[in-house]
């Protein structure tokens, strides 16, 4: 493989001049079978770097730092992604550290609470700027361990207004969380009505995300056989990696998102670590570490379709997508391709009722063949091509505002992993068409030799256990029948200090739970919390599971055989 140094082509590594354009041009000129070397230094990317149509290409850092642009106070449209990778094959990024040129959030501690006026004061750590122009997209509080505790948790509606700044120039101010600067690194914040300020204590840790969604360090579409190895992300504006259709076979080795030692930041990324929307083949993650994320460490799913109309005689099916307000939207043009098998599920039960093969797909219209079963408008659709197999091995997730791993696929093995301090379940296996329109149901899942500690600890109807298998992401589970999921095995896992029971499984046909250990797994004030709940399940086996509560029912069965 030919080796080329970026320094030989005028790419600067002083962290000052933007190298995005020059780097993009160099990459476009590279032949196949090339290793592009980034010698030690900082490479400033103020615009996305395109990597289009390349084969057998490796990007190797040699002590290199990738620094993308982020401003806590300017228009977010000027913030930057890192690399946009499209239609590539056999690609590798390895041995890089990544950060931003500005902080992605700020953090501090509560110094005063005014219940009558619904305000609270926060002393922001001196390492963060406090000018009054910083835009707070959302608020999160954390306990002493840095685990998001939802005492205050907001996603804020952003307003824009044109004001005059201290130089006399006009400037757009973005406001989500309303606050006032009342002293040196001291702010007064008005709390929304839904927040119970009586739970907020002096010294409570608070962070404000300057943005939540919108920027990705590594973005992929139409790529095959990609590896990201030994990547250390210290600051990421939104997501570390996003994988969009139609991608196939991704490996993450030592892909880490965490703040550097000594940092006052509570989040290293404002949203997901890795977000996957339609992957074929396999996903492999080994020795990855995530600490302090604004959302899930991993969410793998595909876009749910819905049948709007069907003409069986002509073999024509019109398919749509629904947004969070349940409004009809067009499906992605990459949602299906010729030869794909589409699974059809009944909307209210999520039980599979048929399938068809795509002969042609355009603008949501499918010309279908091999139609099996009876379809109707409202039925849910999942493309079987996007049920990538998943292998997570020796991965660790700590202190995420949501789940550790949200898994919506088939043939999954999760082993030797550790999850700590997730507000919601450490692992959730579930599709969702109540809010998110994500699929799909799982089959053939093994979770073994993992440790779950301090998961699902906030008061929420979504916190049913450290490992949850059901049919919607948030509240609600008991009205889905057995058979949504199939063949789940959990063995030799340890559950400690869980804010609910350890395991909650619903709507599953084929459950085997062996040798799982439970210590201090109970809801606050409910010492008889069952350690395992099996709801609407069939063909279940539970043996040699052990709890520290001898007087507590270890397994609770609800409509389960």
Predicted regions and their residues:
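Eukaryotic tandem repeat interaction scaffolds
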Residues: 442-468, 472, 479
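Parallel beta-helix/beta-solenoid
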Residues: 31, 54-55, 61, 83, ...
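Mature N-terminal, pre-catalytic/accessory segment of carbohydrate-active enzymes
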Residues: 1-7, 12-19
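N-terminal extracellular ligand-recognition/capping segment immediately after the signal peptide
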Residues: 10-11, 20-27, 32-58, 62-77, ...
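Long amphipathic alpha-helical scaffold regions
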Residues: 246-282, 310-328, 418-456, 518-544
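Extracellular polysaccharide-degrading/modifying enzymes targeting complex plant/algal/animal polysaccharides
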Residues: 29, 47, 67-234, 259-267, ...
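Short glycine/acidic-rich loop motifs that flank beta-strands on beta-rich extracellular proteins
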Residues: 46-48, 68-73, 102-106, 215-216, ...
């Amino acid at each position: 493989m030919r080796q080329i140094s970026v320094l030989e082509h005028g790419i600067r590594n002083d962290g000052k001049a933007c190298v995005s354009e020059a780097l993009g041009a160099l990459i476009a000129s590279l032949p196949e079978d090339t290793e592009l070397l980034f010698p030690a230094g900082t490479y400033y990317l103020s615009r996305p770097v395109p990597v289009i149509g390349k084969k057998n290409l490796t990007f190797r850092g040699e002590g290199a730092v990738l620094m993308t642009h982020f401003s806590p106070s300017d228009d977010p449209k000027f913030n930057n992604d890192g690399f946009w990778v499209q239609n590539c094959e056999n690609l590798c990024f390895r041995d890089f550290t990544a950060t931003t040129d500005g902080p992605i959030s700020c953090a501090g501690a509560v110094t005063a609470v005014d219940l009558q006026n619904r305000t609270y004061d926060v002393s922001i750590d001196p390492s963060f700027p406090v000018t009054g122009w910083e835009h707070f997209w959302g608020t999160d509080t954390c306990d002493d361990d840095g685990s998001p505790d939802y005492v205050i948790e907001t996603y804020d509606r952003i307003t824009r207004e044109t004001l005059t700044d201290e130089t006399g120039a006009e400037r757009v101010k973005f406001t989500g969380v309303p606050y006032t600067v009342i002293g040196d690194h001291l702010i007064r914040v008005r709390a929304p009505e839904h927040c119970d300020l009586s739970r907020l204590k002096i010294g409570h840790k608070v962070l404000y995300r300057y943005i939540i969604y919108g920027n990705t360090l590594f973005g992929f579409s139409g790529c095959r056989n990609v590896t990201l190895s030994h990547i250390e992300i210290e600051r990421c504006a939104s997501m570390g990696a996003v994988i969009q259709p139609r991608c196939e076979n991704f490996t993450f080795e030592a892909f880490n998102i965490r703040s550097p030692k000594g940092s006052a930041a509570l989040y290293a990324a404002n949203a997901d670590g890795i977000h996957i929307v339609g992957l074929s083949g396999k996903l492999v993650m080994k020795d990855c570490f995530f600490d302090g994320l604004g959302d899930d460490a991993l969410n793998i799913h595909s876009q749910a379709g819905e049948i709007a109309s069907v003409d069986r005689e002509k073999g024509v099916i019109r398919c749509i997508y629904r947004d969070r307000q349940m409004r009809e939207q067009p499906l992605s043009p990459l949602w299906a391709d010729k030869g794909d098998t589409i699974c059809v599920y009944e909307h209210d039960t999520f039980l599979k009722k048929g399938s068809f093969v795509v002969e042609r797909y355009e603008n949501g219209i499918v010309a279908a063949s091999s139609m099996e079963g009876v379809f109707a408008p409202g039925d849910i659709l999942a493309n079987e091509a996007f049920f990538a197999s998943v292998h997570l091995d020796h991965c660790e997730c700590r202190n995420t505002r949501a789940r550790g791993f949200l898994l919506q696929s088939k043939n999954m093995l999760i082993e030797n992993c550790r999850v700590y301090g997730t507000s919601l379940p450490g692992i959730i296996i579930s599709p969702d068409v109540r809010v998110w329109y994500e699929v799909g149901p799982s089959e053939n899942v093994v979770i073994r030799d993992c440790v779950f500690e301090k998961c699902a600890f906030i008061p929420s109807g979504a916190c049913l256990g450290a490992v949850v298998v059901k049919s919607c992401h948030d509240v609600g589970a008991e009205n889905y029948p057995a058979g949504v999921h199939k063949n789940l095995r959990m063995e030799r896992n340890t559950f400690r200090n869980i804010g609910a029971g350890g395991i909650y499984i619903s709507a599953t046909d084929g459950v085997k739970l062996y040798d799982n250990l439970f210590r201090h797994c109970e809801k606050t004030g409910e010492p008889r919390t069952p350690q395992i709940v099996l709801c609407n399940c069939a063909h279940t086996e539970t043996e040699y599971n052990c709890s520290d509560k001898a007087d507590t029912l270890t397994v609770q069965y609800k409509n389960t055989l």
